[in-house]
């Protein structure tokens, strides 16, 4: 799959989607995008910046949602112009899709909306690559149905990625079944692993979600070892002060050391090949 000017697939080095959960300010987005661009250039990683203009599925109605569509898109345009990196953001309503697709390079669908047929149809026909997140409630094999919905309407465009972000495991907890990454390859789409939302504890702090940040590198290494096309990580210079998902965000100043390990592991795994595919 051609993605933001590079090839994405299991036969390529993994690409990275990374940034703060919420676009808290223009300066934060520029700082994170600039830092990650430099890190990824040193490590030879294709990089896509991510942030959200609206967190429409917060645990509590009193939680901060974001700066909104207009300001968010203005900030994303500045990231593209000043930093020179592609931008991904998530859309939560069909009405937002045209405006978002006119600005950003990649659209993402929230996990909770992966079975909403009209929504999937709308985002699949927006003319941009789409990262479809697997719902926490969905079996990995069921993502084929989701991808089939997208392909029904996108005129054969090779623009769909699928993303694993953990599965519900009792109340307020998620678990990552690494088999799902191999199973989701059967969709024929590049598979992305979300290493930070996978350690989230949904609603675990009452009115907000908790998280187990210490397990981010554990799951990231495991996913790379299985074999993936892309890695998704939320990062923040001060996770404790992040507007959202701070407990499961990886500190910005620790990204390079973790990514260096993952690059070496990715190279070793892909050089050796995958026995299950032989």
UniProtKB/Swiss-Prot annotation:
<keyword id="KW-0808">Transferase</keyword>
<comment type="pathway">
    <text>Carbohydrate biosynthesis; 3-deoxy-D-manno-octulosonate biosynthesis; 3-deoxy-D-manno-octulosonate from D-ribulose 5-phosphate: step 2/3.</text>
</comment>
<protein>
    <recommendedName>
        <fullName>2-dehydro-3-deoxyphosphooctonate aldolase</fullName>
        <ecNumber>2.5.1.55</ecNumber>
    </recommendedName>
</protein>
<dbReference type="GO" id="GO:0005737">
    <property type="term" value="C:cytoplasm"/>
</dbReference>
<dbReference type="InterPro" id="IPR006269">
    <property type="entry name" value="KDO8P_synthase"/>
</dbReference>
<dbReference type="Pfam" id="PF00793">
    <property type="entry name" value="DAHP_synth_1"/>
</dbReference>
<comment type="pathway">
    <text>Bacterial outer membrane biogenesis; lipopolysaccharide biosynthesis.</text>
</comment>
<dbReference type="InterPro" id="IPR006218">
    <property type="entry name" value="DAHP1/KDSA"/>
</dbReference>
<keyword id="KW-0963">Cytoplasm</keyword>
<comment type="similarity">
    <text>Belongs to the KdsA family.</text>
</comment>
<dbReference type="InterPro" id="IPR013785">
    <property type="entry name" value="Aldolase_TIM"/>
</dbReference>
<dbReference type="GO" id="GO:0008676">
    <property type="term" value="F:3-deoxy-8-phosphooctulonate synthase activity"/>
</dbReference>
<keyword id="KW-0448">Lipopolysaccharide biosynthesis</keyword>
<dbReference type="GO" id="GO:0019294">
    <property type="term" value="P:keto-3-deoxy-D-manno-octulosonic acid biosynthetic process"/>
</dbReference>
């Amino acid at each position: 799959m051609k993605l933001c000017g590079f090839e994405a697939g299991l036969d390529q080095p993994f690409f990275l989607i990374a940034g703060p959960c919420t676009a808290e300010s223009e300066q934060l987005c520029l700082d994170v995008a600039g830092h990650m661009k430099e890190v990824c250039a040193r490590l030879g990683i294709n990089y896509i910046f991510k942030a959200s203009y609206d967190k429409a599925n917060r645990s509590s109605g009193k939680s901060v949602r974001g700066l909104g569509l207009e300001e968010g898109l203005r900030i994303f345009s500045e990231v593209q112009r000043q930093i020179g990196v592609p931008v991904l953001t998530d859309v939560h309503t069909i009405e937002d899709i045209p405006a978002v697709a006119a600005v950003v390079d990649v659209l993402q669908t929230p996990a909770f909306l992966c079975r909403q047929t009209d929504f999937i149809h709308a985002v699949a026909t927006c003319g941009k690559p789409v990262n479809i997140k697997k719902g926490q409630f969905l079996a990995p094999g069921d993502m084929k149905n989701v991808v089939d919905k997208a392909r029904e309407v996108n005129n054969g465009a090779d623009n769909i990625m699928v993303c694993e972000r953990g599965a519900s495991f009792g109340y307020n907890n998620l678990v990552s079944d690494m088999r799902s990454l191999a199973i989701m390859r059967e969709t024929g789409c590049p598979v992305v692993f979300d290493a930070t939302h996978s350690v989230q504890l949904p609603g675990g702090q009452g009115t907000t979600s908790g998280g187990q940040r210490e397990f981010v590198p554990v799951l990231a290494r495991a996913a790379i070892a299985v074999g993936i096309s892309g890695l998704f990580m939320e990062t923040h210079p001060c996770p404790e002060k992040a507007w959202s998902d701070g407990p499961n965000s990886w500190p910005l100043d620790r990204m390079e050391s973790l990514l260096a390990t993952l690059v070496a592991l990715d190279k070793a795994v892909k050089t050796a090949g995958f026995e299950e595919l032989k």
